[in-house]
Amino acid sequence: DETIKKYVAIVGLLTHECGHVLYTDFYHSNEVYDSWLGYNFSWGRFVDVSLQEKAEEAKKALNTYPNIRSVFIYDMKSMVNVMEDIFIENMLNLYYSGIYTAGLSLLNNALYECSKTTQEELYEKVVEGNLSITAAVIINLQIKFKLGKEVRNSQNLSKEEEQVKVLVEDFIDENRNIIEKLCWESDGSKRWMLN
């Protein structure tokens, strides 16, 4: 019985990866990633003038200090991958059945039955429409700082990065009620548009 479950889970993993090939727009996604790494980083559309001004201030800081920007973008890519996973699995469950969807279900149960991380809770809120993906990344970044984790490449925060940390925390604290109302566009055809 356990052997059969393992084989079915492997089918689920292969189905998931095939879903990326079937439903992912790689050309478009690469353009988005490139824009994040450049000076055209998209914060999405904000619903309040003061929040927009704060976002511009944070955007400027992220462009000024490349180290912190790379950490932010690394998290953003990670979260978008999760959003994409959700999208492709919804499509697979919609159009395929039998062992394929059974494999997906078994695989997901095996992956997530042990624990739920803070990131996973953030992802759930994004999927439910209660949190924008940009806000989720900012909050995730804030959590990293509060836990005292080091920046990539095992470097401690510089004075400039400490300033960005404070800026991110202020951004969240001052606009939490608005951030929580922002909604990521979950429609498949617009899944890469963060506004």
What is each residue range found by the language model?
Residues 1-195:
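Short, functionally important secondary-structure microenvironments
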